[in-house]
């Protein structure tokens, strides 16, 4: 068994869609970034890559590479799943937290779990997503950005994909 930890943060700006866990969420602002800026998916990817000892998303999907401009983070998450598979690793579970003052995320959490599980070809029950605020403190509390934390547990399957 191996464990990995991921963290990401993106700035909230006008004129961008808000995508979290592969779900488009109605809101007056969205996250700024090279890809779709899905802060939750990015934290999950870093946790998985960390568990695999395979670096981070910046190494695999650099923000100066035009191939990733505007790309769906669900496509990148699927590629991370492939990296794990090639190393003979399978996801046991993922636990994550989104830190945002708004919007209210509880209506979207189940769909986030389904989307990320689908990208990784695992069961939604293997993906936990929680949301919290910072009670108005810090950049997230002031509505300047959204952060996400994730922990992933993986295990060796005994079969590395080629």
UniProtKB/Swiss-Prot annotation:
<comment type="subunit">
    <text>Homotrimer.</text>
</comment>
<feature type="binding site">
    <location>
        <begin position="61"/>
        <end position="65"/>
    </location>
    <ligand>
        <name>4-CDP-2-C-methyl-D-erythritol 2-phosphate</name>
    </ligand>
</feature>
<keyword id="KW-0479">Metal-binding</keyword>
<dbReference type="InterPro" id="IPR036571">
    <property type="entry name" value="MECDP_synthase_sf"/>
</dbReference>
<feature type="binding site">
    <location>
        <position position="8"/>
    </location>
    <ligand>
        <name>a divalent metal cation</name>
    </ligand>
</feature>
<dbReference type="GO" id="GO:0046872">
    <property type="term" value="F:metal ion binding"/>
</dbReference>
<dbReference type="GO" id="GO:0008685">
    <property type="term" value="F:2-C-methyl-D-erythritol 2,4-cyclodiphosphate synthase activity"/>
</dbReference>
<dbReference type="GO" id="GO:0019288">
    <property type="term" value="P:isopentenyl diphosphate biosynthetic process, methylerythritol 4-phosphate pathway"/>
</dbReference>
<feature type="binding site">
    <location>
        <begin position="132"/>
        <end position="135"/>
    </location>
    <ligand>
        <name>4-CDP-2-C-methyl-D-erythritol 2-phosphate</name>
    </ligand>
</feature>
<dbReference type="InterPro" id="IPR003526">
    <property type="entry name" value="MECDP_synthase"/>
</dbReference>
<comment type="function">
    <text>Involved in the biosynthesis of isopentenyl diphosphate (IPP) and dimethylallyl diphosphate (DMAPP), two major building blocks of isoprenoid compounds. Catalyzes the conversion of 4-diphosphocytidyl-2-C-methyl-D-erythritol 2-phosphate (CDP-ME2P) to 2-C-methyl-D-erythritol 2,4-cyclodiphosphate (ME-CPP) with a corresponding release of cytidine 5-monophosphate (CMP).</text>
</comment>
<feature type="binding site">
    <location>
        <begin position="34"/>
        <end position="35"/>
    </location>
    <ligand>
        <name>4-CDP-2-C-methyl-D-erythritol 2-phosphate</name>
    </ligand>
</feature>
<feature type="binding site">
    <location>
        <position position="42"/>
    </location>
    <ligand>
        <name>a divalent metal cation</name>
    </ligand>
</feature>
<feature type="site" description="Transition state stabilizer">
    <location>
        <position position="34"/>
    </location>
</feature>
<dbReference type="InterPro" id="IPR020555">
    <property type="entry name" value="MECDP_synthase_CS"/>
</dbReference>
<feature type="binding site">
    <location>
        <position position="139"/>
    </location>
    <ligand>
        <name>4-CDP-2-C-methyl-D-erythritol 2-phosphate</name>
    </ligand>
</feature>
<keyword id="KW-0456">Lyase</keyword>
<comment type="similarity">
    <text>Belongs to the IspF family.</text>
</comment>
<feature type="binding site">
    <location>
        <position position="10"/>
    </location>
    <ligand>
        <name>a divalent metal cation</name>
    </ligand>
</feature>
<feature type="binding site">
    <location>
        <begin position="8"/>
        <end position="10"/>
    </location>
    <ligand>
        <name>4-CDP-2-C-methyl-D-erythritol 2-phosphate</name>
    </ligand>
</feature>
<keyword id="KW-0414">Isoprene biosynthesis</keyword>
<protein>
    <recommendedName>
        <fullName>2-C-methyl-D-erythritol 2,4-cyclodiphosphate synthase</fullName>
        <ecNumber>4.6.1.12</ecNumber>
    </recommendedName>
</protein>
<feature type="binding site">
    <location>
        <begin position="56"/>
        <end position="58"/>
    </location>
    <ligand>
        <name>4-CDP-2-C-methyl-D-erythritol 2-phosphate</name>
    </ligand>
</feature>
<comment type="pathway">
    <text>Isoprenoid biosynthesis; isopentenyl diphosphate biosynthesis via DXP pathway; isopentenyl diphosphate from 1-deoxy-D-xylulose 5-phosphate: step 4/6.</text>
</comment>
<dbReference type="Pfam" id="PF02542">
    <property type="entry name" value="YgbB"/>
</dbReference>
<feature type="site" description="Transition state stabilizer">
    <location>
        <position position="133"/>
    </location>
</feature>
<feature type="binding site">
    <location>
        <position position="142"/>
    </location>
    <ligand>
        <name>4-CDP-2-C-methyl-D-erythritol 2-phosphate</name>
    </ligand>
</feature>
<dbReference type="GO" id="GO:0016114">
    <property type="term" value="P:terpenoid biosynthetic process"/>
</dbReference>
